[in-house]
């Protein structure tokens, strides 16, 4: 039987705090959602002034990143993104009752080479959502480093 790392509330809150700190620094009201490896929210936070649509969008991005083990923007990356017209996953955004997000702002949480969850952000443009998401992943990396755990902290993640 395989022993697996599990994302817990402490780590999820730490990530959300880092994302909100970055969003505040760059002046963007974000919604941030951290999900477990099953795609269910551990923490969902909407900053004051963030759009009312943000919670669902952030959750969808986190769900997709966790479940499909890749950053959501990679589905549409030129020239061979799998969700582009003519490619193998064209139309995938219609699956899971429309919850499958194929645009920027969702990142898998990878610890010791295993996807243990996802983080989704909504509120800024693609660059802003990415900056906040990477800040959250970097914060998790710093938190877990003393335990000897490695965390991927970058925008382009595909497992």
Language-model regions, residue ranges each:
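Flexible, solvent-exposed loop/hinge segments and secondary-structure transition points
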Residues: 1-159
């Amino acid at each position: 039987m395989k022993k697996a790392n599990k994302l817990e509330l402490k780590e999820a809150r730490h990530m959300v705090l880092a994302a909100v700190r970055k969003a505040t620094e760059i002046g963007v009201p974000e919604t941030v959602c951290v999900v477990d490896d099953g795609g269910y929210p551990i923490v969902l936070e909407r900053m004051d002034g963030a759009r009312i649509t943000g919670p669902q969008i952030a959750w969808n991005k986190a769900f997709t990143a966790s479940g499909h083990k890749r950053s959501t923007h990679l589905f549409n990356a030129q020239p061979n993104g799998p969700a582009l017209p003519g490619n193998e996953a064209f139309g995938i955004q219609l699956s899971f009752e429309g919850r499958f997000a194929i645009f920027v702002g969702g990142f898998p949480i990878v610890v010791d080479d295993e996807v243990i969850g996802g983080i989704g952000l909504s509120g800024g443009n693609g660059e802003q959502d990415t900056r906040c998401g990477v800040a959250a992943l970097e914060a998790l990396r710093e938190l877990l480093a003393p335990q000897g755990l490695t965390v991927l902290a970058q925008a382009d993640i595909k497992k």
